[in-house]
Amino acid sequence: MNEDARERFAEIASLPDDDIVLAEAALLIAAEMQENLNVPHYLSMLANLYDRFERTIDNETPMGVSVNSLLDFIHISEGFGGNVKDYYDPQNSYLNRVIDTKQGIPISLALIHISLGSRIGIPVCGINFPRHFLVSYGAEIQVIVDPFTGRILSKPDCATLLRQHLGKNAVLKEEYFSPATNKAVLMRLLDNLKQIFWQKEAWVESKACIDRQLLLLPNTAEFTVQLGAVYEMQGNLPLARHTYAQVLQASDDEHLRDQVSKRLLALEPKAKTLH
């Protein structure tokens, strides 16, 4: 693991939300998993993307036209799009690999939209839509875009997307379109990676994701419980018990306390039976 990347990520995590540069933070997440990743190089590549786009537009172009122009640039001219063949490859969450391969998942592709939009002056923010990250263009009039396809979505389109992920009885709610903070975007990016690594039983990588989530939201009991579970899976039972005990001391969440108490009980050393 890249300790320099972790140290810089910790610095960014301590900043006010509006001061966080999402592209840099996302690249640092990737850098911790990949040796010798040159973060400034990829930030420069994003700047070059902006320069290429800027040469295609008129500064006086109405915002609506600029939005369509940017979508065409990202998804047609540059060829960015969703990795439909290997959706759950962790590489899809690493911004440097998305820049290199021009393939990713909704949230990593959203970072391309957000990065370019912020440079151009078009308000672009992430939308923590259930199961499928979206982006919103514009301040007063929201234009909802699926970063996986580059398609502008109507509210009925969003309702269909929701039902595809949550079932036919899912109801579209306005709260699903609330802008995501920068930290919320990073949390979701890390959560996606964590789920992939957890399913692969890649505990070192899972722990790295949890550690960074705790940098973004310190003392969050849910993540501390997950940390205890990682120690348990790694066979470090003393550290697992210690971590679970910390949650019992600090959390008022009865459900979480009950869950942790059961784990602690299961981890108690068994008395030897005399024969």
Predicted regions and their residues:
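A structural boundary/capping signal
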Residues: 1-275
